[in-house]
């Protein structure tokens, strides 16, 4: 009986809503606007920030495409169980910025370069497809859609070396993070660039936001005589809070870092470049490309190459995740003058520890632009054969480490065929000698033509390699005319896996 009475009493407390036809539905309980959680990453009506990381995986777990003639950089697929899925990236999202760099009007290759250069962590600013299309019409430009930090307002990566006064900071006492730093005037931390009152985000590449005070002290003690801190000053913390942007490590600028990448511009001599590229496991346990057997007096040695250097980029493009053969192809594609970015073992150890790419910390380094010409050295597995048709040829392609063949197709509704609109230097397509403007007649033995074939082409290209293409004669004049048409639709055989 007492239980029944309690139930009746509770029922009397239930609020009731009476519909008023003159006022319409004005029930506060049904107000969706008030119930929206502005910190919810699934709130698709505004730009979202996705901080992705490569832990055990080799990639972030999403595929990127761009339509020719449009400024859209579209997430066309998100792999299940990856960082991209866990952080809320969705199929159809438009990428507005990479690490605070607005990419709305950048070329597709530039966006891919930004993401790959970010290394094991990247911050993407994205917007849902339907919201992006409406907002672009209303705003007239993607730049107004993308919230960014002002110039000079960044988290800082500071390397602090202990002196007679210690590290020169104390930590605000609390049972658990977040923590803020109190600096000693003229101390080691202040000299290393730590701003006063900074929030402590990471110690030696590991987040301390959820550590207890005792755990943090133990971590600092284990650092020995030097420690690398990721911190955010008061202005940075305030700006990120206003934008809803995470205090992310890929946004950081380096202060007093113990190591940095080096750019080597090497011109081939009569005896070659004078070094050997070898694939082996690095300090992080992952395969990488390392430089050995640097011959004294030859161009590589004169440019400053040291045995044991790790190759980070070729012509400014990251080689992280590339296999040995593809890396060699990219170097050969440079011809007689190559631009390499390298790190020595000490720098490699440092950037592996902080889990950031050395390419984020290049200082006033001139990087030679990648050439447009493809290499003439063709590996055995990517070949071109004459075809029975006059003016046509047949080629067999194998996908690279990222799953792509290194080219993009374009079709126009009013056009009679498909043609190659872009070739990635160093990719299997470039190695096979294909060029922009080549028309595609057959794929894996099936004739193609026009935009009605895209669904079938997608199925064909998902089949087991090699990919067999029959190509017609090159038509650069027709290519230029087709690209200028607004009815043109771009289609990618294999999107970039990032």
Swiss-Prot record:
Residues recorded as bearing Phosphoserine in the entry: 329
GO CC entries: apical part of cell; brush border; cytoplasm; membrane; plasma membrane
Effect caused by changing residue 329 to A: Loss of phosphorylation. Significant increase in interaction with SLC26A3
Domain of life: Eukaryota
Keyword field contains Cell inner membrane: no
Key word Metal-binding present: no
Chief localisation class: membrane
Purpose: Acts as a regulatory protein that associates with GUCY2C and negatively modulates its heat-stable enterotoxin-mediated activation. Stimulates SLC9A3 activity in the presence of elevated calcium ions.
PANTHER family to which the protein is assigned, alphabetical: NA(+)_H(+) EXCHANGE REGULATORY COFACTOR NHE-RF4, PDZ DOMAIN CONTAINING PROTEIN
Protein name, entry field: Na(+)/H(+) exchange regulatory cofactor NHE-RF4
Species assigned in the record: Mus musculus (Mouse)
